[in-house]
Amino acid sequence: MKKAFILSAAAAVGLFTFGGVQQASAKELSCQPVVTVKTGNTVQNMSLNDAVKKLHINTNIKTLNAANEKEMKQLLQKHAKQSNVKVQDVQKTETAKPAQKTTEKAAADQNTASKAPATAEKTNTTTSAPSSVSAYEKKVVELTNAERQKQGLKPLQIDETLSKSARAKSQDMKDKNYFDHQSPTYGSPFDMMKSFGISYKTAGENIAKGQKTPEEVVKAWMNSEGHRKNILNPNFTHIGVGYVESGSIWTQQFIGK
């Protein structure tokens, strides 16, 4: 049985933030990018095609893919500057990169992939927060479960080992100065979970940078389609949250058992 994997990176807005590649497999890529546009005090989420139309960009690109995404971003940067619209230039592997500042909304970016079942042993789970989980991390779980409750979904249980994995991911992003689901240290989130001895039927990850409080980061995630889908995924049963104060880096890791 194949497993489902969902990734979503929350970045601050007030600019164009480029969405990521949605994967059906490691070799077949299709793009459904979302950008957030700020002109003056107006912030809008729209598709990349709509953003191109908004800036009156003439291009022969009909379908965005991994090969021409760089060209499209360069066009956006050039024309957005002429139109007095901010553009965040990002380097990509699988997902969107962070902006430098935070605002009320985050740009959505969702990746999916199929992968063979993990063979690692299952970890112990608890219904109450372990003592190793910080107050901010507990609050993120509380706010996440409040959003799930609104939709009639079961609350997520805190998994202590998953919490360690999420915290290690946030720390790694700080230490290695990157913002991505793909870690130079641990690989993909799913490889990382496996290295921590975590097994699952389905898994996902949300990351964010710049938000100062649990309320801010959960609000940003909920205002972003990709992140919201992770938070409200009925197949997820357990959660781990990692927060690093220096840099305000946040990671949510989800699994379904």
UniProtKB/Swiss-Prot annotation:
SCP domain: residues covered: 141-254
Name of a matching Pfam family: CAP
Residue span of region Disordered: 80-135
Top-level taxon of origin: Bacteria
Coiled coil region boundaries: none
Comp. bias (Polar residues): 121-134
UniProt keyword list: Signal
Signal peptide: 1-26
InterPro entries per UniProt: CAP_dom, CAP_domain_YkwD-like, CAP_sf
Disulfide bonds: none
Protein name stated in the entry: Uncharacterized protein YkwD
Species, as recorded: Bacillus subtilis (strain 168)
Lineage of source species: Bacteria, Bacillati, Bacillota, Bacilli, Bacillales
Gene: ykwD
